[in-house]
Amino acid sequence: MRTPLLAGNWKMYKTTGEARELVEGLLHGLGDVSDRKVLVCPPFTALHTVRDLVQGTPIALGAQDVYIEPQGAFTGAISPVMLRDLGCTYVIVGHSERRAIFGEGDELIGKKVRAALAHDLTPILCVGETKPQRDAGEAETIVVAQVRAALAGMTPDQIARIVIAYEPVWAIGTGDTATPADAQAMHVTIRQTLGELAGSDVADAINILYGGSVKPDNIDDLMAQPDIDGALVGGASLKADSFLRIVHFLPIQG
């Protein structure tokens, strides 16, 4: 059985003081989460503050991006070595905002996945289609191509250490959400693709998260789907009460 992962992507929000307040609120209401994993991904500037707060708690620490080199003359970049030094165990790679705003392509994203793995970080590889691509009937083709491009040449053992997040671009921050059935169908397609790349045993063990306007009022229906193994949460992770409701989704799969 795959252990659900509920991940909060804070994007470019929260000063260090605001981050402290949010984490304290999360810890106050967290309770028993032994049957699921909880992750927060603050901006780089808040990682140190959040690390000190979540050490020894069930909340894991992740980053929102990483560069492909361990060190060097790469002004403004953050290396996987630095993230590990700060206590990160996860890193988001290939988020649609990185693809669209910063021009990141599949080749660079694949290198970031490898860099994360090489330094014992679990990459959360984000894939997803735009609204025009979905309307044109190309959603599955686009998503499968993104998965294959990012994981090209990797061994089954490497692929087994990756988390996938399906985030339909048209649903991110818009209030629109893929229906649970549509999300489930895409997750099945992704899992089938992983099976072709790494074998069914590996594919069956990989967490595939849904991301795209995940909210307290839709998390239960999403998590009831057999191939949705958690959520990558944006706006709803910025307030303790809403993220806690998502973390405490019901019912647990079993």
UniProtKB/Swiss-Prot annotation:
Highest taxon of the lineage: Bacteria
Family: Belongs to the triosephosphate isomerase family.
InterPro entries membership: Aldolase_TIM, TIM_sf, TrioseP_Isoase_bac/euk, Triosephosphate_isomerase, Triosephosphate_isomerase_AS
The keyword Isomerase belongs to this UniProt entry's keyword annotation: yes
Record's function text: Involved in the gluconeogenesis. Catalyzes stereospecifically the conversion of dihydroxyacetone phosphate (DHAP) to D-glyceraldehyde-3-phosphate (G3P).
Any one cellular-component term (Gene Ontology): cytosol
Keywords associated with the record: Cytoplasm, Gluconeogenesis, Glycolysis, Isomerase
Pfam families tied to this protein: TIM
Subunit and partners: Homodimer.
Molecular function as annotated in GO: triose-phosphate isomerase activity
Subcellular location: Cytoplasm
Keyword Isomerase: yes
Protein name: Triosephosphate isomerase
